[in-house]
């Protein structure tokens, strides 16, 4: 009998590598994980709310974090549907320069004002800056984040703990470098397809209409350019006001789950709709092309 295996973790150190390249001891490990969660969650909400990414055609794909001594360098991977440019030419584009400027304004200035207003909160949280206190708050926040991830109550009910961690980002020199890399239309990634599902379902499209568009896109990539060898998409949830949950799937081509050398990309996402929450799983088998940027990103 076969077992269900995550295709990314099964192929680590053979084809794929970790997305966040850093290591630390047992004291600061849980604290640094929470920093990565806050940065990743900020970028996802920043593109959807402030930039109107559904109308502009920008989709957040992935974020890569590399740490050095008291510095962080961020690599933000963005898919732009209107532009078909290479990653080294995106510095000339004004759209991607706005993301850097708005990041410095929203992320730093917004939370500094909140900390200045809550002086009593600062005295209660920042009187003791020992390692034991930091670890106690970080473990509690990490547990509550996993518990309430689907309901999206994190930013509303746990403001005291979020302000405690955002104080650590108060120095502008802490985030030394921010690189914004745009993926063109030739690049294929499972995260792009899951975000495309999220945009279409919020715009009241049916599932079969979305699956037809994706099937038409993959067939053009498989026949002409041979960038994709196969794919599989599964959806489960209450769609179109049905009382029971439905399970729908679509597959085409070949998918080799057991072989280690096959380049597989996987994504799992939960979407909160009006009636219920639905789940989406995407498997994509990539072709043999050296210039594909997705091969270097988990």
Curated annotation (Swiss-Prot):
Query: What family does the Swiss-Prot or TrEMBL record give for this protein?
Result: Belongs to the universal ribosomal protein uS3 family.
Instruction: Cite the Gene3D superfamilies for this sequence.
Output: Ribosomal protein S3, C-terminal domain
Name of the protein? Small ribosomal subunit protein uS3m
Q: Has UniProt tagged this entry with the keyword Cell wall biogenesis/degradation?
A: no
Q: Where in the cell is it found?
A: Mitochondrion
Its chief place of residence is mitochondrion
**Would the keyword Thylakoid be found if you checked this record's keyword annotation?**
no
Instruction: Write down the superkingdom of origin.
Output: Eukaryota
Q: Write the record's keywords in alphabetical order, separated by commas.
A: Mitochondrion, Ribonucleoprotein, Ribosomal protein
GO cellular component terms, alphabetically, are: mitochondrion; ribonucleoprotein complex; ribosome
MF-aspect GO terms: RNA binding; structural constituent of ribosome
Which organism does this sequence originate in? Acanthamoeba castellanii
Please give the biological process terms from Gene Ontology that the record holds. translation
